[in-house]
């Protein structure tokens, strides 16, 4: 009996030493819960106002999602929706998904912008560089400013921005003459679907009050010179032809002065300084007389030339 008892004690000792009595080797822990993954994308990163964009999102290890940023509400763990933003600007669309393993978020950006159509006019000017100058240096800053080229009818479509809408160079369709360094512009004071760039809008941009352009040049008050196409509407023998003729007179004056000064100084200056000088002289004469200014008189031309030199 004592020998059997000794065997039993020895067996218990061996079992205990091997961990058989309930040590750590016999148990198991549960695996960690996987965290969610989330992805979101747009069919386009930029659209014109009024267009739509498709948004797609998906997730894994998630039980529910919530839209954040420029959209809102509870969302399925994956899906597709069509969005039509109601305004312009930069929008951020986010999605946050959660599950037993926590939550994850992702987002994507969208630019919504307007476009404006327009025409470059002396006669119509084809092949002109059209751009929106945002820093008033009268040159296009590639990559920072919107630009395009006028087509064979002088027309263009450009991404709208605040600034100075400029037409530079090109070919005059009425005469076939190249317009080297011929720069005309319109200061953009607000969005409209159609803009014209003409010698008249160029002078207006340099007046003390651009809205006085009709009064100072005697243009009929019913004409909006910033949206009215003087070429398309000429031929009535009346107010439309008068507007067209004023544009031609301003072109001849500014272009002639530019060529004279460039030849004297051996430079390649564009016409904006000459339109500016014309506007300054118009302001001076109108402030004195409160009458429309005759830009064809020799005194007017000499005063403009003196302002430049």
Language-model features and meaning:
Residues 15-17:
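C-terminal motif of bacterial Sec signal peptides marking the signal peptidase cleavage site
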Residues 25-34, 111-309:
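Feature for extracytoplasmic/surface-facing segments of secreted or surface-associated proteins
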Residues 32-42:
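Proline-enriched interdomain boundary motifs that mark the N-terminal boundary
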Residues 45-51:
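Short, solvent-exposed loop/linker segments at the N-terminal edge
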Residues 53, 89-93, 164-166:
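Exposed beta-strand face motif in extracellular beta-rich ectodomains
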Residues 75-92:
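Solvent-exposed segments in extracellular or luminal domains encompassing
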Residues 104-112:
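C-terminal edge beta-strand
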């Amino acid at each position: 009996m004592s020998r059997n008892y000794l065997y039993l004690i020895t067996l218990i000792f061996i079992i205990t030493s091997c961990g058989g009595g309930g040590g750590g080797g016999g148990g198991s822990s549960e695996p960690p819960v996987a965290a969610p993954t989330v992805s979101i994308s747009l069919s386009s990163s930029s659209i014109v106002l009024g267009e739509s964009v498709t948004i797609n999102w998906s997730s894994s290890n998630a039980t529910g999602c919530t839209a954040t940023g420029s959209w809102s509400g509870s969302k399925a763990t994956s899906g597709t929706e069509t969005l039509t933003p109601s305004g312009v600007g930069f929008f951020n669309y986010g999605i946050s998904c959660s599950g037993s393993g926590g939550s994850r978020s992702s987002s994507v950006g969208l630019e919504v912008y307007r476009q404006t159509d327009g025409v470059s006019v002396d006669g119509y000017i084809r092949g002109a560089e059209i751009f929106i100058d945002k820093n008033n240096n009268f040159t296009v800053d590639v990559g920072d400013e919107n630009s395009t080229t006028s087509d064979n009818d002088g027309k263009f479509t450009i991404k709208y921005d605040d600034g100075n809408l400029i037409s530079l160079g090109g070919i005059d369709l009425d005469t076939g003459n190249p317009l080297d360094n011929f720069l005309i512009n319109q200061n953009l004071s607000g969005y409209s679907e159609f803009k014209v760039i003409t010698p008249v809008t160029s002078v207006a941009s340099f007046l003390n009050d651009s809205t006085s352009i009709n009064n100072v040049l005697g243009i009929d008050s019913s004409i909006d010179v910033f949206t009215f196409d003087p070429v398309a509407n000429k031929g009535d023998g009346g107010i439309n032809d008068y507007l067209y003729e004023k544009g031609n007179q301003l072109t001849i004056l500014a272009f002639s002065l530019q060529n004279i000064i460039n030849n004297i100084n051996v430079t390649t200056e564009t016409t904006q300084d000459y339109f500016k000088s014309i506007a300054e002289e118009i302001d001076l004469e109108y402030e004195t007389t409160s009458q429309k200014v005759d830009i064809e008189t020799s005194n007017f031309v000499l005063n403009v030339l003196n302002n430049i030199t």
